């Protein structure tokens, strides 16, 4: 697997050189992934547990057996407060465009399409999604068992899945506004990289505006429009993500963890943390300890 750095905002996906995609089984006992995006279709097939997926202005709670697709360059975040197991499948847009020339202009959707369907049409859609999930499960089995013929077997299924995506789950061309949004996200890359490297200290609006080369007032509007959250909220999201991981993976005191990650306002921290996880830090740590003693 090609080793690359994955930022917490713009995600650079590590690809398997034999397949040109990323496919793996995720077992998560609890996590928060702040808003980010990538130049790839992302498919999440939840096999056990629950997962909350926020995509720009929408929010969806996935349950066992459900599948969702995230469009390329769409800002999204995920929240896991209970153990889950899922297939994660990421298809780079550049790879897909080799076989589907208009892929960057297509809208892909799996479950929950907005179309009004008759009963026969609805039955057909359910059959298609079940067939799609079955292919993902077969790909997972190959990745887990790794037979000698694994690359050939996996790639055979991969192209079958790509065909299904194009033939059964693409719904027309995206608007021109999508292209403008992608350009705006490109402008934010250095800003988000800077926040990611310096999140554990105070970053002033003047300082971050200079990185963006924007007037501070314009920067605030621009950031909120692109990311769906304010600059300060985003910085706190990054902190919360790191704090959560330390809570469930270390025995460090909460005060030490907060200091490590730059959250100096404890009252605000408690408020933001509870809004994300519906529990106090102590409760999260206790519950996670119980979860990890059981199997999914």
Identify the role of each PLM range.
Residues 2-24, 75-144, 163, 167-173:
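A hydrophobic/aromatic-rich effector-binding and dimerization subdomain
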Residues 22-38:
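Conserved short histidine dyad/triad with adjacent acidic residue
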Residues 36-53:
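Short, conserved beta-strand element in jelly-roll/cupin
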Residues 49, 131-145, 187-198, 242, ...:
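Solvent-exposed, amphipathic alpha-helical segments
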Residues 57-71:
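Short acidic-glycine-tyrosine-enriched beta hairpin
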Residues 166-169, 196-198, 202-240, 252, ...:
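Basic/polar phosphate-binding segments, predominantly the helix-turn-helix DNA-binding elements
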Residues 291-296:
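Intrinsically disordered, low-complexity acidic/proline-/asparagine-rich linker or regulatory tail/stalk regions
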């Amino acid at each position: 697997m090609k080793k690359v750095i994955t930022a917490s905002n713009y995600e650079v996906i590590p690809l398997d050189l034999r397949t040109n995609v990323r496919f793996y089984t995720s077992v998560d006992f609890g996590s928060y992934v702040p808003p980010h995006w990538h130049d790839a279709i992302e498919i999440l097939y939840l096999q056990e547990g629950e997962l909350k997926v926020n995509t720009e202005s929408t929010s969806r709670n996935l349950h066992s057996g459900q599948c969702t697709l995230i469009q390329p360059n769409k800002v999204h975040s995920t929240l896991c407060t209970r153990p889950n197991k899922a297939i994660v499948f990421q298809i780079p847009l550049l790879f897909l465009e080799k076989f589907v020339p208009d892929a960057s202009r297509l809208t892909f959707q799996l479950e929950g399409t907005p179309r009004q369907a008759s009963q026969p049409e609805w039955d057909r859609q359910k059959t298609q999604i079940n067939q799609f999930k079955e292919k993902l499960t077969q790909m997972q089995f190959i990745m887990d068992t790794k037979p000698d013929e694994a690359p050939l077997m996996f790639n055979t299924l991969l192209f079958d899945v790509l065909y299904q995506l194009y033939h059964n789950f693409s719904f027309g061309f995206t608007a021109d506004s999508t292209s403008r949004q992608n350009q705006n996200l490109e402008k934010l890359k250095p800003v988000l990289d800077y926040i990611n490297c310096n999140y554990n200290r105070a970053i002033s609006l003047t300082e971050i505006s200079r990185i963006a080369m924007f007037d501070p007032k314009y920067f605030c509007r621009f950031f909120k429009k692109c990311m769906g959250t304010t600059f300060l909220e985003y910085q706190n999201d990054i902190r919360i993500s790191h704090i959560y991981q330390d809570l469930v993976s270390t025995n460090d005191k909460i005060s030490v963890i907060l200091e490590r990650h730059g959250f100096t306002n404890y009252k605000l921290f408690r408020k933001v943390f509870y809004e994300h996880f519906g529990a106090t830090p102590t409760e999260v740590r206790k519950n996670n300890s119980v979860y990890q003693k059981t199997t999914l």
